[in-house]
Curated annotation (Swiss-Prot):
PTM comment: Phosphorylated by host PRKCA.
Reactions catalysed according to its record: RNA(n) + a ribonucleoside 5'-triphosphate = RNA(n+1) + diphosphate
Gene encoding the protein: PB1
Lineage: Viruses, Riboviria, Orthornavirae, Negarnaviricota, Polyploviricotina
Keywords, in A-Z order: Eukaryotic host gene expression shutoff by virus, Eukaryotic host transcription shutoff by virus, Host cytoplasm, Host gene expression shutoff by virus, Host nucleus, Host-virus interaction, Inhibition of host RNA polymerase II by virus, Nucleotide-binding, Nucleotidyltransferase, Phosphoprotein, RNA-directed RNA polymerase, Transferase, Viral RNA replication, Viral transcription
Motif placement: Nuclear localization signal: 187-195, 203-216
The name this protein goes by in its record: RNA-directed RNA polymerase catalytic subunit
GO cellular component: host cell cytoplasm; host cell nucleus
Presence of the UniProt keyword Calcium in the record: no
Polar residues bias spans: 55-64
Single GO MF descriptor: RNA binding
Organism field: Influenza A virus (strain A/Turkey/Minnesota/833/1980 H4N2)
Region: Disordered, residue numbers: 50-82
GO terms (BP aspect): DNA-templated transcription; symbiont-mediated suppression of host gene expression; symbiont-mediated suppression of host mRNA transcription via inhibition of RNA polymerase II activity; viral RNA genome replication; viral transcription
């Protein structure tokens, strides 16, 4: 049957048609090779935006630094980073005037956090620059390595387990004349294989001690490693993102805690909330502006875009903001918070892996590491790369580039939002002292500006005033990329507003489908995504039912688990048919065992195992939920797991799903090839670290998880906990006298071993 496509839209309000404009099918682009070029672009661009600033030299590291603060006022529309200190401070003062007590209260909240946060906060996050090995590592490993090096250099404040004490060690480490570190290296030898008589490369892993003098250590402590941002849609060029080391991370965390606390109290801030809460918050601002403009005023909204937000921000400005925000607070608190911006003013950008060269004629490939770029002959490079290298050379030290201005992506999102909101706040009539006034929304570098005025000239004047005010604090609104419209239709952080925020369901399309973790998790994630979209994104019942059927189909094809009575032949069908025939209650079989699908849109919230439990044959139950099953490398599954879901646009979302541990919750074994590289020692450290943490969690299950306070070690905490639990269990008759005695004996043995060590 032919369908006239216009019929589809007869009953649909125009704003709901947005889901049909979805451009992002297929995989997003990923980067390959080295990010060195992108990082050089960032460094060079950042310096270009601030080129009229003053040059100085860092006395400790010898790095040349450019300071654009209080530089010349811009005379054209080119982006620039010349923020004026007094303007920023005045904007802060006005923000405080219109929100009495906001800074004071946020400081008190943050002070409490500072005193309570433990070092393990820094284990969150994925890749982190590990300064001891000079490359990226998982956060937990990088932290463990840092603490290990600190302790072997006599820095032990961190043993209390408080983050603030770890940061004391960081400060002290910077005063030391030298730091001794252990590095991993690998030796390669050519040996003849006894069996095949061929020559093979044998690798051995070694650890060696290395001393870093003060200058080298400081350079590493101030280094941000760079990578290429992956999976960015809608861009032809890739760009670089930064990952800081452990010395900077803790300080940044406290600054962002303060800024987050301030953002929570600002109605114009799109951070730190998300989803429906964010939509509600923002809709209020729009409603306020529209209500006030109904009778006499015009109201226009700019869907805003800023040029190179990060590269024009300046850590020195953030220092000024923090100094103002914390002005009545205790000295120690002000010091802790001012260290992050100071470190960022002296930061170094690591250029990454360097360049790969290959000679077609000689079949040779060679890597030019970033360290060599300072003095290699430039005749080997093409013209654009040559220009980049020439430009960056004066800034290079040991393969890192001095980068004083600019912020690097994603470092101070909350604090930069506070700066943006402070300019939006200046739009109140009592500040503009004229007929036009403005308000708006800010979320990191994204903004929407709503201007009200009696006539079009007033609107234009308001926009111009906003534009120029932004310039004074280093924010550059892009006139080319911003779009003005009657209030009621605009876009902000990929939310489209048309008389209310429109559910753009198509953005979630990439997250539908089979994730590929394992049979158990995939089923759970799949139905949870459908459930969440019914709640949040106007996914209607008929469409949801169809999505569910498509998902089940997709799932069966992925895991080759078609129903036991199907005609489809796959590698698994022989086994599944056999299971089908010998099962009495066929409805009890999981879909991944060839069973029928019992999900419909009413029961998506129930894990499949629970949904079918009553319908299962007893022996099937016994096989399915058998922790001793030898074929499954079992991980303990919390009742709630987290999956990372990729929408089409914007950051990956963390989504919770229910997980019931069955024999389908397998984890694939780790690839063997890593075991032959210099990573191996690190991998072993990481596994040991993991085991210790898991054991600790056993003693302090999350339900009763009160972290042991005081300066007890993990072992002491676990032993004392074991004794308390054993006594309670013994007195209530849950364990026998012999068992109680045995536990006490083990505890004493552990303590004895610790003393001997």
């Amino acid at each position: 049957m032919d369908v006239n496509p216009t019929l589809l839209f007869l009953k649909v309000p125009a704003q709901n048609a947005i889901s049909t404009t979805f451009p992002y099918t297929g995989d997003p682009p990923y980067s390959h090779g080295t990010g060195t070029g992108y990082t050089m672009d960032t460094v060079n661009r950042t310096h270009q935006y601030s080129e009229k600033g003053k040059w100085t030299t860092n006395t400790e590291t010898g790095a040349p630094q450019l300071n654009p603060i209080d530089g010349p006022l811009p005379e054209d529309n080119e982006p620039s980073g010349y923020a004026q200190t007094d303007c920023v401070l005045e904007a802060m003062a006005f923000l405080e005037e219109s929100h009495p007590g906001i800074f004071e209260n946020s400081c008190l909240e943050t002070m409490e956090v500072v005193q309570q946060t433990r070092v393990d906060k820094l284990t969150q996050g994925r890749q982190t620059y590990d300064w001891t090995l000079n490359r990226n590592q998982p956060a937990a490993t990088a932290l463990a390595n840092t603490i290990e090096v600190f302790r072997s250099n006599g820095l032990t404040a961190n043993e209390s387990g408080r983050l603030i004490d770890f940061l004391k060690d960081v400060m002290e480490s910077m005063d030391k004349e030298e730091m001794e570190i252990t590095t991993h290296f690998q030796r390669k030898r050519r040996v003849r294989d006894n069996m095949t008589k061929k020559m093979v490369t044998q690798r051995t892993i070694g650890k060696k001690k290395q001393r870093l003098n003060k200058r080298s250590y400081l350079i590493r402590a101030l280094t941000l490693n760079t990578m290429t941002k992956d999976a960015e849609r809608g861009k032809l060029k890739r760009r670089a993102i930064a990952t800081p080391g452990m010395q900077i991370r803790g300080f940044v965390y406290f600054v962002e805690t303060l800024a987050r606390s301030i953002c929570e109290k600002l109605e114009q801030s799109g951070l730190p909330v998300g989803g429906n809460e964010k939509k509600a918050k923002l809709a209020n601002v729009v409603r306020k502006m529209m209500t006030n403009s109904q009778d006499t005023e015009l109201s226009f909204t700019i869907t805003g875009d800023n040029t190179k937000w990060n590269e024009n921000q300046n850590p020195r400005m953030f220092l000024a903001m923090i100094t103002y925000i914390t002005r009545n607070q205790p000295e120690w608190f002000r010091n802790v918070l001012s260290i992050a911006p100071i470190m960022f003013s002296n930061k170094m950008a690591r250029l990454g892996k360097g360049y790969m060269f290959e000679s077609k004629s000689m079949k040779l490939r060679t890597q030019i590491p970033a360290e060599m770029l300072a003095n290699i002959d430039l005749k080997y490079f093409n013209e654009s790369t040559r220009k980049k290298i020439e430009k960056i050379r004066p800034l290079l030290i040991d393969g890192t580039a001095s980068l004083s201005p600019g912020m690097m992506m994603g470092m101070f999102n909350m604090l930069s939002t506070v700066l943006g909101v402070s300019i939006l706040n200046l739009g109140q009539k009592r500040y503009t002292k004229t007929t036009y006034w403005w308000d708006g929304l800010q979320s990191s570098d994204d903004f929407a500006l709503i201007v009200n005025a009696p006539n079009h000239e007033g609107i234009q004047a308001g926009v111009d005033r906003f534009y120029r005010t932004c310039k004074l604090v280093g924010i550059n609104m892009s006139k080319k990329k911003s779009y003005i419209n009657r209030t009621g239709t605009f876009e902000f952080t990929s939310f489209f507003y048309r008389y209310g925020f429109v559910a753009n369901f198509s953005m979630e399309l990439p997250s539908f489908g089979v994730s590929g973790i394992n049979e158990s998790a995939d089923m759970s994630i799949g139905v949870t995504v459908i459930k969440n979209n019914m709640i949040n994104n106007d996914l209607g019942p008929a469409t949801a039912q169809m999505a569910l059927q498509l998902f089940i189909k997709d799932y069966r094809y992925t895991y080759r688990c078609h129903r036991g009575d199907t005609q489809i032949q796959t590698r698994r069908s022989f086994e599944l048919k056999k299971l089908w025939e010998q099962t009495r209650s066929k409805a009890g079989l999981l879909v991944s065992d060839g069973g029928p699908n019992l999900y419909n849109i009413r029961n998506l919230h129930i894990p499949e195992v629970c949904l079918k439990w009553e319908l299962m044959d007893e022996d099937y139950q016994g096989r399915l939920c058998n922790p001793l099953n030898p074929f499954v490398s079992h991980k303990e599954i919390e009742s709630v797991n987290n999956a990372v879901v990729m929408p089409a646009h914007g950051p990956a979302k963390n989504m919770e799903y229910d997980a019931v541990a069955t024999t389908h919750s397998w984890i694939p074994k780790r690839n063997r090839s890593i075991l032959n590289t210099s990573q191996r020692g690190i991998l072993e450290d990481e596994q040991m670290y993991q085991k210790c943490c898991n054991l600790f969690e056993k003693f302090f299950p999350s339900s009763s998880y009160r972290r042991p306070v005081g300066i007890s070690s993990m072992v002491e905490a676990m032993v004392s906990r074991a004794r308390i639990d054993a006594r309670i269990d013994f007195e209530s008759g849950r364990i026998k006298k012999e068992e109680f005695a045995e536990i006490m004996k083990i505890c004493s043995t552990i303590e004895e071993l610790r003393r001997q060590k």
